[in-house]
Curated annotation (Swiss-Prot):
UniProt-recorded name of the protein: U-scoloptoxin(13)-Cw1a
Species of provenance: Cormocephalus westwoodi (Westwood's green centipede)
Reported modifications of this chain: Contains 4 disulfide bonds.
Cellular compartment(s): Secreted
Any one GO molecular function term: toxin activity
Signal peptide: 1-22
């Protein structure tokens, strides 16, 4: 009898673990989607200290230490 209860308990724990993992994967996917919607695409103007370029690109083309630079950077 104890063997049957142990199997049922193991089965329930396994199912709950799979559900938790599926929720984490779905949450991670939503977080990535929000990040990609908020990132600055290629060749768009960006500010080096505040904007986030989309993955694979960097905010380049300006010098924040040069007072003559108008800070027109682009995600490249």
């Amino acid at each position: 009898m104890a063997y049957i209860f142990a199997l049922i308990f193991a089965f329930v724990v396994c199912i709950n673990t799979d559900v938790i993992q599926a929720e984490e994967i779905q949450h991670d996917t939503l977080r990535n989607m929000e990040y990609r919607l908020s990132c600055t695409p290629k060749n768009s103007e960006c500010e080096r200290m505040t904007d986030i370029c989309c993955p694979g690109f960097q905010c380049l083309g300006c010098n924040p230490y040069d007072k003559n630079d108008v800070n027109k950077c682009k995600c490249q």
